[in-house]
């Protein structure tokens, strides 16, 4: 797992209070990890702060899984 993936995983575990074993790249924030719409907004804000990137609303709507977040952040920080 990349450094970015590890950092994303840590944020998800802290914000959603889920077991780290459940946070896989395929895990859906809503369907698998129990996030609601407010949780997803807070996660996006936490990702922006942690990685120093801006995630516009239209992009945030496409980030549905942990893997989506990792890919977006890695592309934005490349």
UniProtKB/Swiss-Prot annotation:
State the Gene3D superfamilies in the record.
ACP-like
Domain annotation Carrier: ranges? 2-77
UniProt modified residues of type O-(pantetheine 4'-phosphoryl)serine:
37
Write out the pathway annotation from the protein's UniProt entry.
Lipid metabolism; fatty acid biosynthesis
Gene Ontology biological-process entries = lipid A biosynthetic process
Task: Name the protein family.
Answer: Belongs to the acyl carrier protein (ACP) family.
* Gene Ontology MF terms in the entry: acyl binding; acyl carrier activity; phosphopantetheine binding
Q: Which cysteines are joined by disulfide bonds?
A: none
- What HAMAP family does the annotation carry? Acyl_carrier (MF_01217)
InterPro entries in the record, alphabetically? ACP (IPR003231), ACP-like_sf (IPR036736), PKS_PP-bd (IPR020806), PP-bd_ACP (IPR009081), Ppantetheine_attach_site (IPR006162)
- Please report the name of this protein according to its UniProt entry: Acyl carrier protein
Question: Which cellular components does GO assign to this protein?
Answer: cytosol; membrane
Location comes to: Cytoplasm
Record organism: Chelativorans sp. (strain BNC1)
Which PROSITE patterns would you find in this protein's record?
CARRIER, PHOSPHOPANTETHEINE
What is the protein's known function? Carrier of the growing fatty acid chain in fatty acid biosynthesis.
> What does the entry report about post-translational modification of this chain?
4'-phosphopantetheine is transferred from CoA to a specific serine of apo-ACP by AcpS. This modification is essential for activity because fatty acids are bound in thioester linkage to the sulfhydryl of the prosthetic group.
The record, for SMART domains, names: PKS_PP
Alphabetized UniProt keyword annotations: Cytoplasm, Fatty acid biosynthesis, Fatty acid metabolism, Lipid biosynthesis, Lipid metabolism, Phosphopantetheine, Phosphoprotein
Name the domain of life: Bacteria
State the organism's lineage: Bacteria, Pseudomonadati, Pseudomonadota, Alphaproteobacteria, Hyphomicrobiales
